[in-house]
Curated annotation (Swiss-Prot):
Pfam families, per the entry: Radical_SAM, TRAM, UPF0004
Organism: Afipia carboxidovorans (strain ATCC 49405 / DSM 1227 / KCTC 32145 / OM5) (Oligotropha carboxidovorans)
Record-listed [4Fe-4S] cluster 2 binding positions: 168, 172, 175
Alphabetized InterPro entries for the sequence: Elp3/MiaA/NifB-like_rSAM (IPR006638), Methylthiotransferase (IPR005839), Methylthiotransferase_CS (IPR020612), Methylthiotransferase_N (IPR013848), Methylthiotransferase_N_sf (IPR038135), MiaB_methiolase (IPR006463), rSAM (IPR007197), rSAM_horseshoe (IPR023404)
Protein name as annotated: tRNA-2-methylthio-N(6)-dimethylallyladenosine synthase
Subunit structure: Monomer.
Transmembrane segments: none
Amino acid sequence: MIMTPPRKLHIKSYGCQMNVYDAQRMVDTLAPEGFVETADPAEADLVILNTCHIREKASEKVFSELGRLRVIKEEAARTGREMKIAVAGCVAQAEGAEITRRASTVDVVVGPQSYHNLPKLLAKARDGAPAIETEFPIEDKFSALPAPKPAAIRARGVSAFVTVQEGCDKFCTFCVVPYTRGMEVSRPVADIVADAKRLAENGVRELTLIGQNVNAYHGDDENGRTSSLGRLLHRLAMLPGIARLRYSTSHPRDVDDSLIEAHRDIPAVMPFVHLPVQSGSDRILAAMNRKHTAADYIRTIERFRKVRPEIAFSSDFIVGFPGESEQDFADTLALVTQIGYAGAYSFKYSPRPGTPAADMQETDTALAVPAAVMDERLAQLQALIDAQQASFNRAAIGRTVEVLFERAAREPGQIVGRTAYLQPAHVMASPDIIGKVLPVTIDSLERYSLKGRLASEETAVASLRSTQRESETFA
């Protein structure tokens, strides 16, 4: 019997956690078609660019990468090997047929809601004409994407993403997500629980629930009642084997009582929340259509801290939004100083075509913040954020913290895991600790990574008792 050699697949993903998750599901979708992953695009039979449309010149970066892939594709053709190129993700959704017009080497253009149709699109592309699908049948995507095989789950490690929600209804004036991912749609509770159970049965210990606006989750449960994210977390915490639960990314407006209570009542929900605010200026927040004030955001932070004092936060910030004044920027610095973040991401404003903010700046060019001013503000903000992150990390030295060990580190004999706050932590230990949550005494800090040693049994018990007493005090 002659065995057909597997076809090789290379996926390059840009941007958010949702794209990482989507890349895995594309791998699962194409596995029955005989595709296996490769890290080398030069040996791939299919290359997929899984794109992001959030940042400046996203489309141009894609076309630049397509130029490099064209050379690889032509070289493959000279050796008698056919190579297909697909563009997926939010640039595919936004640009559509324009991609194949500008880059004739592209065979498939597929939006985020149509990945389950990849085999059909590839078959269509074999006829010579490019296959393009950028519709919005998002319910079909959730129901039609195949579940990963047990071997694939185990190979991906002890932490996994689970999509619970997709799309956004907020229409922030700077953002393209509602136009590229569509309106908010939530998966049924039963489907999410089934996915999580399958992951747990195959060695996953930590689940991160993801969505463009994850705390807007409003899926139906088995009784037809609408479930909040907080109630969903309660359901997932009951699954055997799941030690940690996270979620990302959240909108301050959608933090409700049930989510606060989940942080109070469920030890598995990690005390680390990514809660983007974008600006500390009420004037800029209004121009962004965020529908909350800086004071609203601070009150939300305080609600979390009241029920879980050890909780920490990260955030996103945009500097140089159209019309941002020195006072507006000073308000942002003041908010960052008041909150005290464990980390944050800051970016210069970049106009996204078709968004209200881009139109606003185009209509009134005086609103545009000069590039040099944006650079200066970004450097100042990032320096403050970096100092806060360094201080937060240094505070771990000398403490015993719980670490979920994920994999072997680059240095021989070391195993790396993550703390409750997603800090990498390295110890010298046997690989058999991978998948376990163990107490680690932190001895030092190297850049953003903690280094320590497995705590002695006596230290571990004392640490866990201390944590338990704190939990009882805060309940």
